[in-house]
C-alpha cells in the first residue's frame, strides 16, 4: 500500500484472529461446481470461519486503517473455498458488502449478477455502493489508457513480456531471491574437479518430466561439466527409484532438484510424488553428498529435515533455475532470505 500499488487481490484465507464468524458447508445440491478441483480431487468439508474475501474486516483494514484508495479484487469466486459454503449469489453480495470492487471469475456469472441485482432491489446493497466501485474501475481503466486503447495488441505482447528489459528484471529478481537455508556439508559453491561425477535427481509433481530440469542442468553444465539426470514423477516405477539410488552411490555429488509446485485441486498439491520421496529419503539415509534445491514449495525441508544442504529458488521459471545454477557454481552472491518461517527449524529472515 505504501508503495502505491493500484489494486489488491484478497484471498479466501480464514483468519479467525481477525474475524471469527462461523460458516458451515451448504447442502451439496445448492453448491456450484468448483473450478479449482479436478474430478475426484480432495475437498475439505467442515465448519470454518469466514474467508477474508467476504469479511467486512477486510475492507475496514484496507480502507480505514491502511487508507488504501485503489481497487480491491476478490480471488476467484469459483474456488471451492467459497462454493462449499456460499451460493454464487450470496458470495457476490457478501464480497461487495466486505468492500470488494471487482468480483473475479464467478462459477456462474448469471447467478452472481442476479444476486447483486436482487440485493440492490431489496436495499441490502445501495446503488451508491455499486457506483462507488464502478467509478474506481473506470478510473483505473482511464489511468491505464484503456479508454483510448481498449484492445490489447496481441502481436506486441512478446516484445513487452519477453523483451530485454523484462528478461533483465526477471534475472535480477531471481538472483536476489535464491536462499541458502542450510549448508552443513559446505557444498555451496561447488568445489569439485572438472571430471567429477554429478547426478541431478529431478523430482516433479507435474506432468513435465521431459523438460522440467532442462534450464537448470543446461546452465549448471555450461563449461563442459557432465551431469547425469534422472527424473521421477507420479508415474515412476520402483525400478526407476532404485536406479536413481544406485546412480547416486557412485556420484561425487547428488543434486536433488525438487519441483514441488502449488497445483490447485490436485492431490499432494505442494509436495513430492511418492516415488521421488522414497528416493530422496534413501539418499538421505545413505548419507550421500546431497544438495537439495526446492524450485517451488520452500517448506519441503520440514518433510525432509535430514537434508544437510538446502537451497530455495521458490519457482521453476527459467530465470530462477538459471539463478540457482549460478549460485551453486559461485557465480553470484547468495543474498536471499526466507520470507516465511520453517516451524521448528528456521525463522523468517534466515
Describe the role of every protein-language-model region.
Residues 50, 55, 84-350:
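Preference for extracellular/luminal or secreted protein segments
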Residues 1-129:
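Second-shell residues forming the walls of enzyme active-site clefts
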Amino acid at each position: 500500500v505504501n508503495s502505491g500499488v493500484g489494486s489488491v487481490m484478497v484471498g479466501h484465507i480464514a483468519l479467525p484472529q481477525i474475524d471469527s464468524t462461523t460458516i458451515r458447508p451448504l447442502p451439496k445440491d445448492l453448491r456450484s461446481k468448483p473450478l479449482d478441483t479436478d474430478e475426484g480431487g480432495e475437498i475439505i468439508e467442515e465448519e470454518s470461519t469466514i474467508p477474508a474475501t467476504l469479511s467486512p474486516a477486510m475492507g475496514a483494514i484496507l480502507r480505514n486503517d491502511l487508507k488504501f484508495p485503489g481497487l480491491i479484487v476478490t480471488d476467484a469466486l469459483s474456488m471451492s473455498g467459497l462454493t462449499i459454503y456460499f451460493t454464487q449469489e450470496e458470495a457476490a453480495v457478501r464480497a461487495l458488502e466486505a468492500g470488494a470492487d471487482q468480483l473475479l471469475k464467478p462459477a456462474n456469472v448469471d447467478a452472481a449478477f442476479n444476486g447483486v441485482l436482487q440485493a440492490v432491489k431489496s436495499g441490502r446493497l445501495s446503488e451508491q455502493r455499486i457506483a462507488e466501485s464502478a467509478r474506481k474501475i473506470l478510473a483505473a481503466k482511464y489511468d491505464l489508457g484503456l479508454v483510448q486503447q481498449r484492445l490489447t495488441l496481441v502481436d506486441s505482447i512478446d516484445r513487452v513480456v519477453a523483451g530485454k528489459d523484462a528478461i533483465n528484471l526477471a534475472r535480477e529478481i531471481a538472483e536476489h531471491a535464491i536462499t541458502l537455508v542450510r549448508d552443513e556439508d559446505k557444498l555451496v559453491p561447488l568445489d569439485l574437479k572438472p571430471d567429477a561425477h554429478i547426478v541431478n535427481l529431478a523430482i516433479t509433481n507435474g506432468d513435465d518430466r521431459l523438460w522440467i530440469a532442462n534450464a537448470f542442468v543446461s546452465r549448471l553444465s555450461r563449461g563442459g561439466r557432465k551431469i547425469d539426470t534422472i527424473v521421477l514423477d507420479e508415474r515412476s516405477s520402483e525400478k526407476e527409484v532404485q536406479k536413481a539410488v544406485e546412480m547416486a552411490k557412485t556420484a561425487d555429488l547428488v543434486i536433488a532438484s525438487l519441483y514441488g509446485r502449488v497445483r490447485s485441486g490436485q492431490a499432494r498439491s505442494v509436495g513430492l510424488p511418492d516415488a521421488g520421496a522414497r528416493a530422496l529419503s534413501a539418499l538421505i539415509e545413505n548419507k550421500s553428498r546431497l544438495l537439495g534445491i526446492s524450485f517451488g514449495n520452500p517448506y519441503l525441508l520440514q518433510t525432509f529435515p535430514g537434508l544437510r544442504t538446502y537451497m530455495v529458488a521458490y519457482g521453476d521459471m527459467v530465470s530462477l533455475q538459471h539463478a540457482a545454477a549460478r549460485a551453486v557454481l559461485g557465480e553470484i552472491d547468495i543474498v536471499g532470505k526466507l520470507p516465511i518461517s520453517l516451524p521448528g527449524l528456521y525463522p523468517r529472515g534466515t
